[in-house]
């Protein structure tokens, strides 16, 4: 969480943020702070929210590859999708080389640290797995 505070303060954002664990209040607080820092006020065209499993990864990836419309970045928020337990392989492959203008914020209750998606996110979110906070 300290890294997120530092990124917000400096304006140097990572392309991927992963917030996970049981502390729902902290996850929500930091997700809100990231949304305010990453997204322009009223920019609904470049801000996307996905919750649960009711979305197509193919459509998400297509949208992620699209340049933002009249904005610096496109931001995609994912909440309790279960992608870090199963089904996230396709997204992990995309995140190995994502569009530079698309940013991702994942908020999950549980993650499988053996999953390809988790390992891919660690490459962007922190210099070492030890810095990933639960």
What kind of feature is each model-predicted range?
Residues 1-83, 89:
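P-loop/Walker A NTP-binding region and its immediately flanking N-terminal helices
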Residues 44, 100-103:
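Short, surface-exposed connector motifs at secondary-structure boundaries
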Residues 77-79, 103-109:
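Structural recognition of the conserved hydrophobic beta-strand(s) that form the central parallel beta-sheet
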Residues 82-85, 111-113:
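A short acidic, glycine/proline-enriched capping/turn motif at secondary-structure boundaries
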Residues 90-101:
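Conserved catalytic/switch belt of AAA+ P-loop NTPases
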Residues 112-123:
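Short regulatory helix/loop adjacent to the ATP-binding pocket of P-loop NTPases
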Residues 124-134:
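Single conserved hydrophobic/aromatic residue that forms the stacking wall/gate
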